[in-house]
UniProtKB/Swiss-Prot annotation:
GO biological process: BMP signaling pathway; positive regulation of transcription by RNA polymerase II
UniProt organism field: Rattus norvegicus (Rat)
Domain of life the protein comes from: Eukaryota
UniProt name for this protein: Zinc finger CCHC domain-containing protein 12
Family: Belongs to the ZCCHC12 family.
Zn-finger region bounds: CCHC-type: 345-362
Region (Disordered): 1-20, 270-292
GO MF entry, a single one: transcription coactivator activity
Listed Acidic residues bias regions: 270-282
SS bond partners: none
Amino acid sequence: MASILSRMGNSRGQNSPLPPWAHSMLRSLGRSLGPLMASMAERNMKLFSGRAEPAQGEETFENWLSQVTAVLPDWHMPEEEKVRRLMRTLRGPAREVMRLLQAANPCLDVEDFLRAMKLVFGESESSVTAHSKFVNTVQEPGEKPSLYVIRLEVQLQNAIQAGVFAEREANQARLHQLLVGAEMSTDLRFRLKSLLRVYANEPERLPNFLELIRMIREEEEWEEAFIHPKRPRRSQSVERALSPTFQSSPPVMISSIDCNVIEIDDSPDDSDEDVILVEPDDPPLPSSSAGPSFLGRAVSEDQVLVIESPNIFEIQAPSTSSGAGRKNNNNFGELRRARKRKHTVHCSHCGEEGHSKETCDNESDRGQVFENLIITLQELTHTEERAREIFGEAIGLSELH
């Protein structure tokens, strides 16, 4: 009747409500037509006899059960009246069996009625199979508890349809099998056991399927975040350690034993050339493994040239104009090509810039030579101190890594 009233109200428009007498008439009509409509629906229900071969107008047990399950939500009446209507749909052996059951249990409700029908007329083999599949459903290796619960729910619904469990026992059966067949944290297991113990006589208050899934998912997310955090793979750690961003730039040491003139070129289209002069007659530079001893004593600036490199990896040794250059192998690995820098070359004989002692053609007096030499030594001393600071920082960073 409520649907009829709403339809009539919508047809007349929101601004023109029905008069009170119309509402009263429709209520009376609804009270009169209600039993008639229920009786018509009852007459349209199929019959079930329980015989092996259904007669004309009868249905198999599966079709009868599907029809009853569909109409039960529309039956707003006491349990006794529902059972009475269900009895009217039975014929033959099915009616006799349920009459005996009802005589033995006068307080029989609809749920117990349907459960008894499933046990008697349903396929007994399917009931046993459904129950066996449910109790033998356990968590597989590597399977998350949340996925196991979803797989378990399928078997539980099959068992309920086969009459193994009543609908009101679903939460209890689900929770019990979860504790038996799943691996979970100690905290979650304790909470679920406590719920099962507290609500042993009130299974409807136990968490249903969706609530149980939510509890398990929260526990899994907490474990992933705090107990089993994702660790970077070894290859990622090595790549991060080798990244130029996380490394500082140690000095590149070039010994004078290899070449006289070093030409450093950044790119093919760079027109500037840096020429670095190194004295060839000086002793070779000590190896990089003797870093502390190298810092502990004075080294002539004619023996070593220190260049600040922007990166310590994959720097290629510079090519020499005389063709005698070789790769500089040290503790820092294969070095990248150094960036170009301007270095002023002084002649130790005359003190002028732009040429070396071997190519010097100037003849100056000894006083001027010594004065120029003192100036050159002062400049090189400042360069040496700077080189020691840079080399010390590079040694410290290499020890940290």
